[in-house]
């Protein structure tokens, strides 16, 4: 998006802003109230991007939250929760954040390390003995023939997707098919009697399926953050969702971040839409991801993709990491722990999608135009990131599948930079 387009978007916004729901006030970190600031006044170019995507019916609605360099929180929004309803999207609307759950799980592991109950290079098998005799597929593209693993899987490997584990959705090879046949699809809503009962059951099933690579040898996006949930549970002696609630969600003030919808939450949950290859065809609502599906009881808590959250809540979480582990007046973790979370801990010689990797999230390495940025995304197009060098955090909430089916992010990012006065070197 070039500067002329941004200026044109500003004109479009000023002419037609009244047709869309704009943001409320901004608040300052540390619990102190800020003067009321309209999102239109602070983020006019970003607001125009949201407005245009909704006006063109590419999305029913979108919500963005920004922790600005001056410490204020700014929320902008456009549209509704569904193409067929008139309930407006807002900072407290609810979204399935899928893999953005991974950053929360990574933070939970970090505070457990701060407690002295876990270390980065501890062998996973010391905590999950089911993993004591892992095997590696000799040719994962051809079959499940395997040999004993030569390398030891560690907590670092789980955090950075270098464990040798994979995802059922990461292709259609023999190993991925074995995951599907075993019911290892964490993060997806399921009935009251799922094939995989809980994290212990998942680990036992994973131990019987070969790894697709030696631990520490390659980056492969995977269920490793789900396995990390079991590590946290066993190392802490506290059920994984309870540990996350006590050590991350409660102190940050993430009151609307849940594993299952509570009574009354369904009215705030945005509909997920699936987009086909024919972009001219209207998207369809995904029935399998309905509010009803997310209200059912759950026994398998997915640290890799199970949370529902709001723009306000997730921005609060990102702001805590940006603010060296402090959420308002509450100390959630030590500054050095917050720094560790956003430190590149990939095994030497590896890259992850062209960059580094921290505690569950991607890191822009030196030389990248977004050097130092840390964050991750969700399957339905949600995105969250912090930029410590430029002192801001941001999150985008939409519900469009598959990921990047509606590529609003490529236009929103330069608009946010322009609104915040950030100049990047190409």
Which residue ranges define each predicted feature?
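N-terminal secretory signal peptides and thylakoid transit peptides that target proteins
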Residues: 1-24
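Bacterial Sec signal peptide processing site at the extreme N-terminus
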Residues: 26-40
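Short, conserved catalytic-motif segment at the N-terminal edge
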Residues: 38-97, 117-119, 133-140, 421
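Active-site SXXK
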Residues: 44, 50-51, 64, 70, ...
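Short, surface-exposed loop or secondary-structure junction motifs
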Residues: 72-75, 135-371
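Acidic helix-start/capping segments at beta-turn-to-alpha-helix junctions
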Residues: 125-134
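Short, gly/Ser/Thr-rich active-site loops of penicillin-recognizing serine hydrolases
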Residues: 323, 337, 342-347, 366-367, ...
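Short, well-ordered beta-strand elements
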Residues: 384-385, 391-400
């Amino acid at each position: 998006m070039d500067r002329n387009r941004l200026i044109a978007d500003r004109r479009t916004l000023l002419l037609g802003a009244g047709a869309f729901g704009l943001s409320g006030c901004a608040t300052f970190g540390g619990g102190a109230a800020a003067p009321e600031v309209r999102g239109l006044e602070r983020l006019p170019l970003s607001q125009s991007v949201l407005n245009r995507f909704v006006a063109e019916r590419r999305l029913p609605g979108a919500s963005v939250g920004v922790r600005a360099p001056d410490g204020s929180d700014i929320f902008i929004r456009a549209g509704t929760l569904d193409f067929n309803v008139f309930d407006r999207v807002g900072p407290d609307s609810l979204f399935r954040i899928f893999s953005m759950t991974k950053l929360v799980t990574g933070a939970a592991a970090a505070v457990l390390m701060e407690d002295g109950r876990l270390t980065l290079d501890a062998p996973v098998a010391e905590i999950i003995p089911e993993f004591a005799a892992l095997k590696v597929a000799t040719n994962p593209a051809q079959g499940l023939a395997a040999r004993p693993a030569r390398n030891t899987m560690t907590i670092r490997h789980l955090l950075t997707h270098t464990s040798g584990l994979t995802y059922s959705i990461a292709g259609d090879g023999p190993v991925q098919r074995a995951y599907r046949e075993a019911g290892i699809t964490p993060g997806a809503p399921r009935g009251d009697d799922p094939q995989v009962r809980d994290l212990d059951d998942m680990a036992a099933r994973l131990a019987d399926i070969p790894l697709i690579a030696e631990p520490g040898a390659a980056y492969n996006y995977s269920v490793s953050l789900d396995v990390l949930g079991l590590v946290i549970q066993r190392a802490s002696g506290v059920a994984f969702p309870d540990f996350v609630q006590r050590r991350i969600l409660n102190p940050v003030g993430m009151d609307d971040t849940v594993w299952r919808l509570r009574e009354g939450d369904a009215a705030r949950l945005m509909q997920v839409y699936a987009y086909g290859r024919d972009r001219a065809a209207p998207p369809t609502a995904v029935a399998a991801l309905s509010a009803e599906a997310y209200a059912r009881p759950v026994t398998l808590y997915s640290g890799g993709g199970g949370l529902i959250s709001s723009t306000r809540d997730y921005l609060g979480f990102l702001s805590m990491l940006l603010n060296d582990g402090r959420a308002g007046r509450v100390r959630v973790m030590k500054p050095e722990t917050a720094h560790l979370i956003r430190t590149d801990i990939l095994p030497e010689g590896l890259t992850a999608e062209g960059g580094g990797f921290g505690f569950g999230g991607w890191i822009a390495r030196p030389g990248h135009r977004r050097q130092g940025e840390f964050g991750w995304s969700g399957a339905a197009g949600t995105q969250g990131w912090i930029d410590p060098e430029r002192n801001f955090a941001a999150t985008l909430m939409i519900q469009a599948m598959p990921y990047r089916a509606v590529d609003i992010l490529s236009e929103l990012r330069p608009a946010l930079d322009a609104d915040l006065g950030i100049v990047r070197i190409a």
